[in-house]
Amino acid sequence: MKNKMKVVIIEDEAFAAQRLRKMIQEFNPEIEIVAELESVAESVNWFRTNPNPDLVFLDIHLEDDLSFAIFDKVHVSSAIIFTTAFDEYAIKAFKLKSIDYLLKPIVHEELAAALKKYEELTGFMHNALELQSLYDLIMNKDRKYRERFSIAVGSKIKLLE
């Protein structure tokens, strides 16, 4: 059984957060939105006390700072889709673990494309990890095989090397 995708929305505008939540759930009702956060401080605290979600939707301009400050204060291993009204931060955003950069107002088709991109990338990574594990099993040269065998010959036991 596939685990539900866990998502965090970091957005200081209540209407924008509500609209994004609705659009995500329309795209896939199975996506679990585990937190909606409004500030850098609240986000840093949340990431320090909770496991990283699969995906973060992140506005850049938050009430207390630019969201990039989150990454200076706490390790975030989640994939990120930036959602912002400002295009000037795109290069900086893609230097992080950014999957996409959506300009507000977010259009359904662009959100769907970003979520599909995330699913494709994570599917690719999962397949790559499986292939690597299979390769490691096949090519395991460190594996030790038995060098001695005992066999019964009549009433005696003989050792073979």
Write out the residue ranges for each language-model feature.
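Non-catalytic signal-transmission and effector/linker regions of two-component phosphorelay proteins
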Residues: 1-6
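Hydrophobic/aromatic residues located in beta-strands of well-ordered beta-sheets
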Residues: 7, 33-34, 80
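Conserved acidic carboxylate
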Residues: 11
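Charged phosphotransfer/docking patches of two-component systems
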Residues: 14-18, 90
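Charged docking surfaces used in two-component/phosphorelay signaling
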Residues: 18-26
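CheY-like receiver
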Residues: 26, 42-46, 53-135
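Short hydrophobic/Thr-rich beta-strand motif most characteristic of the beta2 strand and flanking loop
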Residues: 30-40, 46
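Conserved binding/recognition cores within well-folded domains
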Residues: 120-161
